Structure formats: C-alpha cells, structure tokens
Amino acid sequence: MLQSMGDGEISISPYDTAWVALVEDDGGGRRQPQFPSSLEWISSNQLADGSWGDAGTFSIFDRILNTLACVVALRSWNIHPHKTEKGIWFMKKNMCRIDEENLEHMPIGFEVALPSLIDIAKKLGIDIPTQTRGLQEIYARREIKLKKIPRDIMHQAPTTLLHSLEGMAGLKWEKLLKLQSEDGSFLFSPASTAFALQQTRDHNCLKYLTNHIHKFNGGVPNVYPVDLFEHLWAVDRLQRLGLSRYFEPEIEECIAYVHRQWTEKGICWARNSQVEDIDDTAMGFRLLRLHGYEVSADVFRHFKSDGGEFFCFKGQSTQAVTGMYNLYRASQLMFPGENILVDAARFSANFLQLKRANNDLFDKWIITKDLPGEVGYALDVPWYASLPRVETRFYLDQYGGDDDVWIGKTLYRMPYVNNNKYLELAKLDYNNCQALHQQEWQNIQKWYRSCSLGEFGMTERSLLQTYYVAAASVFEPEKSQERLAWAKTAILMETITSHFEFQQLSRDQKRAFITEFEHDSILKYTNGGRYKRRSSLVGTLVRTLNHLSLDILLAHGRDIHQPLKNAWCKWLNSWEEGGDAELLVRTLNLMISGGGRRRRWASEELLSSNPKHEQLLKATIGVCDKLRLFQRRKVQGGNGCMNATGITTVEIESEMRELVKLVVTRSSSEDLDSEIKQNFLTIARSFYYAAYCNQGTINFHIAKVLFEKVL
C-alpha cells in the first residue's frame, strides 16, 4: 500500500464532479458537455434516498451541497429528469435540517459555495426552500468570509479563496490566472478550476481537469493532489498504532519525499503550493525533526499574527482543533532557544484546554471516532512522558479506521490514512506483544521469588511497575533481551538501594558487598569447577549478569560480561550520587541484538571514544538525576505533582530539550547509530514518566497496557 503512494488515494466528490460536468465544450456546433463521463458518474452514484454524498456518514451539509450541485448539473443538460426530481425532493425534505447541524462540521468554503449554487439553481427553475434560520446564517457567514480578504488582495496574492472561486461574480480573471498553481489548478480544487475553465477556456485548467477525469473515471475528488497530506498522515497513523517498525523503508521514503517539498514558509496538503497551512506544516515539522532532518522552527513565524495568535490560514473565520492539536504536538520537539515554539506550545495548549473545558472538541477538518480522547491524551501526557505502548494502547481505542471521515468541500475518505487493515493489524500486533509481555512478567515473578528479592525490600508492586516501564518503552518482541535486561537491572538497582538504606548497613558492610561483587567473576570456572550458587544478593546479581551476558554470547557471539560488570561496579561505587540512568543506558546499548535494518552494535570502547556518546551520556545522567530527585520529593511530600502548565522545573525542561536535540540531529557521517541515540531518550522519557504521572495514573496505565486485551 505505502509503496504505491503517488499523488494520493482519495474518494470522489459529487459536488466537484458536478462543477466539472457543467463545463461546456467550446468546439463549435451544438451545445454539449466538455466532460460527458462526469455526467455518467453523477447518474451512476445517486444514493437510495435521492441524495449524493458520503454513503457511510450522514452530514446534512455534505448531502445538501452535493445533491444541489448534481441536480444543477443534470438539469443544466436536461438529462435524467427522474433522478433530478428525486434529488429536489430530498432537498425540500431536508433543507431545514441545516439548522440542527454542528457548525464545526461545515465543509470548507460551504458558506461561499452553497449560496452560489442556489443562485444557479434558481436560474434553472429549481425550487429550493431558502427561508430557514440555518440558511440565513450561512449567508451571513459568506459576507464575513468575503470581507476578511478584500477583493484587491484576493487578485494580488494567493489566498484560500482560490480554492472556492466557483460561482463568485466580479472576478478579474486576467489577474487570477497569474495565481494559478503549477499543475494548472486553482489551489488544487477541481470545482474552482472547472469554474475558471468555464470563464477563461484556459488550456492549463483544461489539462488539469482532463488528467484527473481520466484518473478517476469521470469523477473528481474535492481536492487533488493530496500527496503531502497522505504521506505525512499515513506515517503518523502507523507510528501511533505501533506498526512503524514493519514499514521502515516505506516510511523513510515518505519522509524523504516530504523533505524534498519542504520550504522555509512551510507546506500545505500538496506539493508546489503557493499557500501554506499550519496543520500540514506542523505535522511535517514534527516528523521531519523526529527522523533527523534539519528544519527550522522559524517556519511557524509565518503563522503567527501581530497579536500573538497562531492561525492555520490567513483570513480564516474559525480555528481548527486538529490544526492546534498538531501545532501542540510539534512544539514539544523544541530545541533550546526556540522561543517561537514556546509561544506555540502555550497558545495551542491554552486553546485546546479551553475547548476541552467547554466540551467543544469538534473539528472542522475531520469527523473521527474519539478526537476528545486524542486531545486529552496529548494534554494529560506530554510527549516527554509518553511511553510508546501507552500511546498505542489508547490510540487503538481512538482510531476509527474506515469510519473516520475527512471534511473538505465535501466529506471524503483517505484510505491510505484511515483503514481497517491498519486497525486489524495493529490490534493483532498489540495483543501478540501483550501476550509475550505477560509471559515475561510471569517469568520475572518466578525469578523474583527464586532470588528472594522481597527479603531485601523489593515489593511486588515495585516489581510490576519496573517491568511495566521497560515493556512500555521497549515493547518489540525482537527486543526481548533488551527489555528483560532493563527490567532486571532496574529491579536489582532498586533492591540493592533498598537493602543498603533500609537495612541500615554500615559503611564497612556496604564496602564488603561491593568488594565481594568486584572480586567475583561473571563466568567463574576454577580448575574445571562449576560456579557455586549463593542465596545472597551479591550472588543474585552475579548470576543475573551471567545470564544476560551468556544470552548475548550465544545469540550474537559477543562477550559483554566485562563492560557489563564495569558498569555495575561504577554504579555500586557511586549509588548514593545517582547514576541509575547511566547503568540502564549502558546496559541497553550493550544488549542491542544487531537484528533488523538499523540495529548496529558498537563496542563499549568505540562508544566511549565518541564525543557525541559522551554528550548524550552527560545530558541523560543530568536530567534523569533531577527527575529522580523530583519524583522522590513528590512521593515524600505527597503533593509534588506537576503544576497546571505541565512544567516540572525550568532546568528539567531545558535539559530535556537539549537531550532531544542531541538525539534527533545528525551531526556528521561519523554520528552514532540512531538506535543507540534513541536509547538515551527512551531512558530519559521513562524517568520523566515516573516523575510526571501520579501513582493512580500509573496503576491505571499498567492495567490497561499490560493486562487489558484490545478487542
């Protein structure tokens, strides 16, 4: 599916097809349609109730606009009178329902398009009821929109009105043709371009429409192409569904394609656009930055008004929830000093929080299964604290698959973005991973009991939470060794800390513990003698490192026992000073299996000599130690939760931004492998999660992520 991406897979718009069908052939002789196949499409796609529109979702805005346009097209050519009358009957019966519709779901340009169609219908003798309160409000909105962008500006510079020219009077076409897109369209709108062809007979308009009529067998979408939109949103959906690892080559190509079309002013839904929007720009910025491309945050200055507000399009009449949602998500990838993203985060968060407080999380661009849930998760669990399996588990409940429908000039579908195949695969993959995690959890409990870790102060609740954090962060089945190494390392660190602190060991006793470990061997064979099992905590530690090292030796032929032991020796000798994050990240990087396209192991010596590695290590240790301190104070104080703005301390936020920059930027051809870099951020985000979320939230996440099967 992803390999066949081109200009975009999208459903047909009866409204736009009707405008194309209205175009006359100027070849001389008798009056005839330029595109007879469009009339055939209209004739073949009337719904049973007499309307035209999206069959899966009933929106009166969508049905009225599509039906009126198709009726006008059929009456204009005096064909299919029965279908025409059936469509008129539908409108007479349902026009009053416009009063009841949610205005947030009004199609793009509806307030301009519907009045224009009504005027044409009246000239054709089509009797349409117009004296309804809802329709009068539509006319009022039309005047507001047209006044927002004065006619002189409209003819001088590209604006969103180029997308909705159809039916507008008093246009200066000699000026508008200079604003035509490279593909011959007017802002990629078939309806707007068809109207321009009617008025100008422009060859480029004709070429654009002819190409798409042929491609879509007589019909046309409400907008085309949608290449950037499709590339970006398909990747976003796959990532959030937890499926991206299956499509790495395709995703890399998608992101590279977007990067080739990127401009300093941003992008819109299609390449080579003269108009940019904040929604596509924010999604593009976020995904490009996540994949290591250099993109400047200054791009968002083009979407900020003098009053400090951010907008999607200049001259917009309403603000889209999803536009601000994606701006908020993009802002969380800020680097140090990017004040424009600080402003964007503040503005978008305030907008979304107000919408949520007013129970008003409806969007003008999409009707989706659970937009309030998506926005709520983003506000409640910021990106730094969002563990991959937690996000995916919630998104599996929020993603509507085939049922999600987009709002353009009409309702439309994007099958490469929203489809049940993604959803079915994601559910199957999640449940398979969860089953493996549950089996691992059973084995962790057996290990815990066999090692008598409870006697040293490790509780079963802490055991579960520690394994959960590892499994929610490194969830892939092929990363079982890394996941278990993380979990057992964290469990043993907590057990030893508890043993040292709560058993009130003397300094000499602690030193004896460390000395015993340092002088023992990971693999101890003396004169052919076997390693002697011991019940002590030191023995448990030695045996665990033995097993971890042996697993890697047998599976990949690498001997990691000495660097693993060295990492533990360092932690034991400085455990009071922190350093948990360093031990975890060193363990993860030693355990990298080397499988897959990107998974390349590097020796401890090679890593230690890499300046970027040392920068990452220093940054990770610094921020994780602060987060751990914050978490302990929160537990001890009982009310040390994050404040309402989601900020811990200025220092922590600043250091997280620096770490993100170190991880996602590519410094040179000698840069570290991406997975090694990601491990630093993965560990830091797990610490942030523990510090950010209260215990009740964590317990809820554990139950949902580890034990609640996706149905």
Curated annotation (Swiss-Prot):
InterPro entries: Isoprenoid_synthase_dom_sf, Terpene_cyclase_plant_C1, Terpene_synth_N, Terpene_synth_N_sf, Terpene_synthase-like, Terpenoid_cyclase/PrenylTrfase. The keyword Magnesium applies. It is an enzyme of class 5 (isomerase). GO terms for molecular function: ent-copalyl diphosphate synthase activity; magnesium ion binding; terpene synthase activity. A motif (DXDD motif) lies at residues 277-280. Gene3D superfamilies: 1.50.10.160, Farnesyl Diphosphate Synthase, Terpene synthase, N-terminal domain. It holds the Pfam family Terpene_synth. Keywords: Isomerase, Magnesium, Metal-binding. Mg(2+) binds at D277, D279. GO terms for biological process: gibberellin biosynthetic process; miltiradiene biosynthetic process; terpenoid biosynthetic process. Its cofactor is Mg(2+). Substrate binds at K145, K364. CDD domains: Terpene_cyclase_plant_C1. Its EC number is 5.5.1.13. GO terms for cellular component: chloroplast. The Asp-Xaa-Asp-Asp (DXDD) motif is important for the catalytic activity, presumably through binding to Mg(2+). This is Ent-copalyl diphosphate synthase 1. It comes from Isodon japonicus. The lineage of its organism: Eukaryota, Viridiplantae, Streptophyta, Embryophyta, Tracheophyta.
